[in-house]
């Protein structure tokens, strides 16, 4: 497929600065792009590469100026969003052929839409419901009475346990596990007694969950991933957690039981949250933060234990200077000790002088 820069700009609602007649055949990164390619610059720190790229066209912000005659710009509101739209044109998704493979196992009582695609090695349990346009790749397991909503995609080796509910247009990447038992144990004395986990996981529409992420079923009730949430790879979500609409959870985050996230919360990579917390709407938690208390709405916290982000920045700015500060402190301590000794010696001398005067006066 080839499209002119003018055609691309019209599609994106952008403005061409340069030669709009050049034909574009591919979309590539700014370092790899060559003649006939289009790339993008969404981060200001990469604007210097506009002079270096071999691309024929670059998606840029509205206020970016053309660096020279060698590259044509398409000015848009958001280059990254425009890139996403452009990729759907140059690299459209292939439509899966509907049907159930003879090598899939479907128990009696399962309901599967005729427009669903079920690959070899899929296991669908009794009472499960598979909606229209769903794609189940090899190795997927769908438990008893689980529901997979319309146009959802479950990549290889995804496991959806019994009675869990998956909404429409949900994407579960390879190895994701939905509905494994919550980590619920009572330990009277030194015994660990398992508490049955009889709740479910509910995943609402338009959620995407990364590879090898695990979401535990609730002890009672539901673990709930609300509409539009995006979860990265290797995330652990414990029993009865609620993640509010359009929140973003980055890789290796761990969320303990019964913690509730509000709307549009962002958790940075490797953040850890203890249980039974309330994280307010639009809050942001920095990478590797240890969250031990509630986080108010619209706040930004970082560090372990977490604290307001600005306080954490001030603390971190001191760390590189700690060795020098330690040497300075030791030097000051020695000076103070020396001054104290001199002061004591001075006092002794004064005492001796005073004693000598008294003796002279008594004579």
Swiss-Prot record:
Molecular function in Gene Ontology: N-acyltransferase activity
Record flagged with keyword Transcription regulation: no
InterPro entries per UniProt: Hexapep, Hexapep_transf_CS, LpxD, Trimer_LpxA-like_sf, UDP_GlcNAc_AcTrfase_non-rep
Transcription regulation found in the keyword field: no
Catalytic residues in the record: 239
Similarity comment text for this entry: Belongs to the transferase hexapeptide repeat family. LpxD subfamily.
Protein name: UDP-3-O-acylglucosamine N-acyltransferase
Source organism: Syntrophus aciditrophicus (strain SB)
Gene (UniProt): lpxD
């Amino acid at each position: 497929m080839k499209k002119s820069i003018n055609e691309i700009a019209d599609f994106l609602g952008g403005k061409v600065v340069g030669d709009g007649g050049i034909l574009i055949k591919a979309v590539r990164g700014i370092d790899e792009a060559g003649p006939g390619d289009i790339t993008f610059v969404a981060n200001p720190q990469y604007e210097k590469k506009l002079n270096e790229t071999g691309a024929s066209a670059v998606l840029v912000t509205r206020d970016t100026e053309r660096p020279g005659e060698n590259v044509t710009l398409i000015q848009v509101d958001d280059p990254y969003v425009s890139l996403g739209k452009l990729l759907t044109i140059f690299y459209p998704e292939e439509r899966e052929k509907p049907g159930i493979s003879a090598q899939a196992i479907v128990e009696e009582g399962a309901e599967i839409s005729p427009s669903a695609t079920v690959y070899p090695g899929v296991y669908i349990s009794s009472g499960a419901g598979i909606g229209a346009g769903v794609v189940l790749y090899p190795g997927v397991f769908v438990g008893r009475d689980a529901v997979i909503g319309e146009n959802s995609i479950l990549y290889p080796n995804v496991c959806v346990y019994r009675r869990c509910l998956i909404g429409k247009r949900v994407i579960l990447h390879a190895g994701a596990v939905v509905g494994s038992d919550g980590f619920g144990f009572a330990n009277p004395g030194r015994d660990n007694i398992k508490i049955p986990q009889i709740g479910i996981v509910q995943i609402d529409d338009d959620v995407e969950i990364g590879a090898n992420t695990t979401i535990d079923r609730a002890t009672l009730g539901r673990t709930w991933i609300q509409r539009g949430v995006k979860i990265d790879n290797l995330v652990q979500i414990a029993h009865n957690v609620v993640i509010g609409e359009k929140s973003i959870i980055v890789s290796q985050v761990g969320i303990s039981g019964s913690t509730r996230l509000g709307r549009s919360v962002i958790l940075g990579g490797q953040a850890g949250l203890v249980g039974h917390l309330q994280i307010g709407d639009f809050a942001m938690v920095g990478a590797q933060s240890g969250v031990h208390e509630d986080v108010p709405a619209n706040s930004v916290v970082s560090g372990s234990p977490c604290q307001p982000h600005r306080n954490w920045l001030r603390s971190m700015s001191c760390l590189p200077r700690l060795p020098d500060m330690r040497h300075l402190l030791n030097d000051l301590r020695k000076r103070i000790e020396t001054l104290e000794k001199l002061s004591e010696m001075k006092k002794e001398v004064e005492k001796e002088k005073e004693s000598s005067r008294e003796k002279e006066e008594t004579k």
